[in-house]
């Protein structure tokens, strides 16, 4: 008993010390190499399916990114972040931590450290594993591990993992509805979808190969958080497993039949078999249209820890809604009956609503203390992106960068704080916010000099 108490005290002290030492934003990853196997300490081993969702943890899913010589893809980057010194004070003077192995999963909403689901993480000492892109950018989905404050506003990332969620040709499109289809998956968009190299969906020709980051919604549907056009590249598909046939070694993801007979399964499947309802990401070495997709890798999508007492924050779309006390986000059962709800009226909760939730796991259920509505079908919702850092590559208020992200702050309605547009220039310390990224450029709505 004495040893257990001592161990708990040391763990809490270590986590608090990490937060107290925070302060500056992290840099991006550089270099090449394969992705590191992923299995965060403190998460459940195996890949649990809690009545249709993804549980468990311990991805460990091989090195089969598409950056190998055989595929010529973007590859992956695994590195320790280097401090950029953004003077953010992230984690300093914090209100305490829940657990040292807290997990956040969602789309990146800001840079300077990084912001995921409104929680700002210091990434100075984080291990970064980024696949399918050269660096982490706004709109990419990610899983962040590390201690957080009790109010879920700041944290210290120890590990950041990010991969693309869908890649393939756009085979059909409904621009009026803001949706398209890739590999049998219906991709929906909203005001917060980042368009990396196009003004919007209407500007992308049918048949274009797209790389999409997004959060799984109902089976066969992905809510896009970032869309990029790509040259021909091998497929990636993310979705909920249905129609699993362990004899034929096939299952479906939306309208796509997947053959996994020759695939490498992520280490998480060693303890808990692949099952219907699991959310997975699959990769193939070659594309085959039409017909089943033969994949080379099947791995759990960013796994959610199921251990009681672990702090978890998720950004995703509500499914299986049965009331505020029972619904799912990213396959995880959520109880928001006692949550503080912001961003819209509580009566707006329901299937298809995009939310951010934060709380503590208890017997496989995420008991949330905070819930923010981000998008309500037919109504919309708040979209906000944030950059914290110094101005670089300044040409004019219409063309500069912060944290490598292009910014346009030339609009007549841009609000400046602690200065004016005349104070913009390379080296200026700023916080920039806006609600749209079009053609890869953040359209600034507010610039505050720091």
Task: Locate each region found by the language model.
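Short, flexible, surface-exposed loop segments at domain boundaries
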Residues: 2-4, 18, 22-123, 130-412, ...
